[in-house]
């Protein structure tokens, strides 16, 4: 009996000891000693291979190696000239290959390729998602920032800090990271208090998931409703981290920098131009009749401008009767009504009367119009009145809509109060005069004592004023980007079961204990909270930040990561296949100044990367998926590399970088009715990373190749092989048109000889000469059905679609 008790006690002690030991990913990184006789990466891989009695494969031939590394680092195939130069280089392969790698890493194409991997992780898109899926017109600035940062080899610790606290570090565009995901913003679903609170919790949850899974490989979001079931993350940790971002808001913000300074310098000249035009108009005002009546529902659109309040001044009505309104709405670039009383907007007005005392004044901004049951707000005095709405937080407005109580003409002005306190006019009565593109004849515009020519001149003058005001508003607002903006942080509450209506206790901002010892002062200013988190995560000894990043890079080079679950390094994730290598890479990455390009160079110059991909029967029996890396694992290219490759091979690739993207669909936002475009001009022949990214909408053709729709994080893309992929490429108007361009290029460069044409087609598309059987088959196909069909089939071949 005593022996049994002793045994049970020992089991308890052992179990307790195991339970107390931190999970592998939370333990300090260990630096292994590496033999100087081989490449450091090969040193770790060969040890695992020996355990299974396996060996490396032979090195790939130079042509295969060049195509592999070129597609891997730039996403584009090498040109025949580049293949010839590398194949004929008399230097040792190590030396010649290193020069190739440095050339590719220095190419602007490198940042375009690897930015897509990062955007997948954080599910970046240019629409909101959820029920509205409205457009984020200025979100492309963040995409361009990522591309530029990767091309400049911005150290990863700086890359991370800029994205968490770019307003402090001077990288405004980087703040697009925090609001990259979908957002169900307050007021979009429901306007009652519970719906508003839930929406706010949801949008902050998206931020926490982006940061925790994208940067740290931890599912902190699982602790929103209760303590994490598997990892040492408490519910208090979740809300403490939420408090770090409690001042964050989604929307447009002003982009500081040279462009902003340039725009600001142009404002005085534009103001003078506008003043001169208005003086010219005033001299003719007496000739104008009273403006046409307002429609019962009227809208004014203008250049996006960030505002904290809006006011409408009604100077006169047609018959001197009192002005009246049923509803007043201020619409943001995200499709949200910022004037909603339920969203915290506060209306005020000059003295007024109610047509029926049962209608509250705040009904003006309740987002609902029902003339059968509602009664309008009516100014107490005829002729003039004003209405003002102060927003709960600054909003980027693009249009104003109001529902007039009666269709009487009005003389009005609408102004917004910018964050700096200045008022800016965005709409006024003259906006309702005919534009210079009005389809009506000049004789139909009723102006007193004016000929048709004089009327048209006046209409053109008013149109010029309107255009100039739009230009002035745009300059005064400054360049806009879609990125996180910040206000005084909301109070953060610990919520019972995550229910926003069941508040338990106030919580101060805090870094979760699982991430290591760090403190944020309870009263820390909003930006200092985020900066403290960023500095903590980029400490050289942090156990997660570097591990997670090097694993992502490894995965995108070999198809699989050292950890199979790149965004979950917790207990529900997988253990690393080569833990010593993972730690060594992470520490070396930090030692090399967090340089991503040095990390790429280290990986692709290793022997395991340069192996042939040919299968070996004995090795396949032991490790069919080549997880131990006894050969280079072949894989299908991603959708972007396939489309970009087609354009490159056809000679139509437009290498213009940056700016607003081209469209795959007939519209840029909305929940439904997306129609894929069938033809593209030169702008649509840019690299696919520059396509306008619509959330929740698969891209025509290339969606079949597992191109994610940004509805969810995609730390690792699916690599399916289906008949739909081949059918899509064979029947796609885009692919067929590029095949025709491809054939035309081949004819121009190879002449009329069939053999020479097929040879060049293979060298362009596959970076190699065709095998005799391939030459014969494609030549026969070209003779019977035309060179276009041979090129079309080549686009569908494994030699083109796969990285070998």
Regions found by a protein language model. Give the residues of each.
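Bacterial N-terminal signal peptides
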Residues: 5-16
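N-terminal pre-domain segments of enzymes
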Residues: 19-37, 482
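Primarily short, surface-exposed interaction patches in extracytoplasmic proteins
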Residues: 37-67, 72, 77-109, 125-162, ...
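Disordered, acidic Ser/Thr/Pro-rich linker "stalks" and the adjacent N-terminal cap
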Residues: 267-308, 317-395, 405-408, 422, ...
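Extracellular beta-strand elements of beta-rich domains used
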Residues: 328-330, 400, 414
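Short, surface-exposed beta-strand/strand-loop-strand elements in extracellular ectodomains
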Residues: 408-420
């Amino acid at each position: 009996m005593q022996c049994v008790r002793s045994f049970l006690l020992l089991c308890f002690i052992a179990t307790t000891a195991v339970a107390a030991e931190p999970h592998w990913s939370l333990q300090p990184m260990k630096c292994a000693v590496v033999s100087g006789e081989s490449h450091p990466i090969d040193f770790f891989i060969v040890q695992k291979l020996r355990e299974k009695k396996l060996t490396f494969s032979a090195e790939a031939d130079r042509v295969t190696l060049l195509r592999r590394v070129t597609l891997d680092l730039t996403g584009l195939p090498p040109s025949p000239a580049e293949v010839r130069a590398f194949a004929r280089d008399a230097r040792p392969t190590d030396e010649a290959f290193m020069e190739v790698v440095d050339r590719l890493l220095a190419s602007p194409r490198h940042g375009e390729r690897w930015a897509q991997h990062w955007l997948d992780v954080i599910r970046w898109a240019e629409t909101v998602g959820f029920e509205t899926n409205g457009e984020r017109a200025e979100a492309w600035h963040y995409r361009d920032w990522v591309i530029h940062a990767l091309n400049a080899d911005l150290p990863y610790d700086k890359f991370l800090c800029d994205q968490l606290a770019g307003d402090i570090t001077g990288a405004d565009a980087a703040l697009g990271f925090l609001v990259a995901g979908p957002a169900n913003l307050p007021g979009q679903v429901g306007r009652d208090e519970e719906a508003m609170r839930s929406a706010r919790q949801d949008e902050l949850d998206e931020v926490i998931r982006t940061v925790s899974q994208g940067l740290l490989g931890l599912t902190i979001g699982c602790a929103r409703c209760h303590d994490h079931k598997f990892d040492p993350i408490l519910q208090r940790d979740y809300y403490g981290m939420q408090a770090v971002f409690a001042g964050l808001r989604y929307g447009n913000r002003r982009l500081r920098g040279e462009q902003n300074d340039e725009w600001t310098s142009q404002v005085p000249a534009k103001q003078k131009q506008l003043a001169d035009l208005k003086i010219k108009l005033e001299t003719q005002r007496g000739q104008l009749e009273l403006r046409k009546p307002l429609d019962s529902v009227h809208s004014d659109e203008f250049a996006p401008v960030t505002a904290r309040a809006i006011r409408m001044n009604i100077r006169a009505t047609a018959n001197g009767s009192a002005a009246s309104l049923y509803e007043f709405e201020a619409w943001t670039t995200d499709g949200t009504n910022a004037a909603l009383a339920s969203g915290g907007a506060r209306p005020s007005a000059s003295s007024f009367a109610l047509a029926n005392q049962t209608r509250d004044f705040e009904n003006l901004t309740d987002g609902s119009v029902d003339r059968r049951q509602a009664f309008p707000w009516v100014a107490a005095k005829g002729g003039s009145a004003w209405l003002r709405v102060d927003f709960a937080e600054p909003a980027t407005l693009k249009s104003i809509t109001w529902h007039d109580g009666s269709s009487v003409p009005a003389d009005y002005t609408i102004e917004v109060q910018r964050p700096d306190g200045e008022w800016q006019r965005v709409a006024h009565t003259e906006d309702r005069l005919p534009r210079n593109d009005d389809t009506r004849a000049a004789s139909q515009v009723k102006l007193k004592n004016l000929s048709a020519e004089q009327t048209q001149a006046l209409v053109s003058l008013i149109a010029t004023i309107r255009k100039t005001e739009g230009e002035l508003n745009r300059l005064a607002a400054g360049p806009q980007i879609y990125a996180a903006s910040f206000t005084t942080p909301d109070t953060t509450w610990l919520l019972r079961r995550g229910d926003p209506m069941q508040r338990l206790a106030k919580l101060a901002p805090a870094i979760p204990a699982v991430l290591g010892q760090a403190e944020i002062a309870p009263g820390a200013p909003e930006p200092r909270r985020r900066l403290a988190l960023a500095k903590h995560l980029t400490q050289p000894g942090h156990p997660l930040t570097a591990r997670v990043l090097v694993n992502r890079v490894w995965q995108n080079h070999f198809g699989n990561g050292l950890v199979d679950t790149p965004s979950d390094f917790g207990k529900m994730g997988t253990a690393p296949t080569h833990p010593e290598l993972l730690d060594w890479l992470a520490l070396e990455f930090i030692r090399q100044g967090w340089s991503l390009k040095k990390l790429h160079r280290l990986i692709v110059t290793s022997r395991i990367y340069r192996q042939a991909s040919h299968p070996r029967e004995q090795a396949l029996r032991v490790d069919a998926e080549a997880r131990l890396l006894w050969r280079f694992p072949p894989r299908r290219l991603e959708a972007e590399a396939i489309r970009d490759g087609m354009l490159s091979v056809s000679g139509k690739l437009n290498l213009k970088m940056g700016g607003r993207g081209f469209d795959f669909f007939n519209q840029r936002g909305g929940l439904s009715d997306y129609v894929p475009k069938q033809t593209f001009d030169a702008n649509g022949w840019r690299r696919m990373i520059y396509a306008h990214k619509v959330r929740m909408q698969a891209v025509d053709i290339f969606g079949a190749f597992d191109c994610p729709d940004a509805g969810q994080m995609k730390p690792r893309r699916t690599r399916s092989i289906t008949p739909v992929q081949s059918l899509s490429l064979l029947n796609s108007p885009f692919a067929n048109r590029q095949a025709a361009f491809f054939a035309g290029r081949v004819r121009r460069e190879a002449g009329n000889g069939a053999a020479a044409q097929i040879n060049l087609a293979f060298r362009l598309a596959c970076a190699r000469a065709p095998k005799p059987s391939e030459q014969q088959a494609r030549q026969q196909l070209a003779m019977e059905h035309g060179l276009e069909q041979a090129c079309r089939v080549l686009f569908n071949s494994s030699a083109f679609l796969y990285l070998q």
